[in-house]
UniProtKB/Swiss-Prot annotation:
SUPFAM superfamilies: Ribosomal protein S20 (SSF46992). One of its GO terms (molecular function) is structural constituent of ribosome. It comes from the Bacteria. The keyword Ribosomal protein applies. This is Small ribosomal subunit protein bS20. Keywords: Ribonucleoprotein, Ribosomal protein, RNA-binding, rRNA-binding. Signal peptide: none annotated. It holds the Pfam family Ribosomal_S20p. Residues 1-28 are annotated as: Disordered. Residues 7-23 have a biased composition (Basic residues). Binds directly to 16S ribosomal RNA. The gene is rpsT. Belongs to the bacterial ribosomal protein bS20 family. It comes from Salinispora arenicola (strain CNS-205). GO terms for biological process: translation.
Amino acid sequence: MANIKSQIKRNRQNEKRRLRNKSVKSSLKTAIRKFHEAAETGDVEKATVLMREAARKLDKAASKGVIHANQAANRKSAIAKRVASFSA
């Protein structure tokens, strides 16, 4: 346990941020998993809707600094490519 007042505050802030980031990452994983499940069943319309939702969550996570912007771009690209393969 820290004795310095500023370090006690930093620990408190870090714990709050860790929990917030964990929540964002969890909802992000859920959105991507739902997209993959819809894509595997072959439901194009549902997959397209879920792709937009996942892309929105990826952008939001990147803007909050939970994940890196390039990681968000790569994941969005991968799911967009998968949706494009349905129509091709």
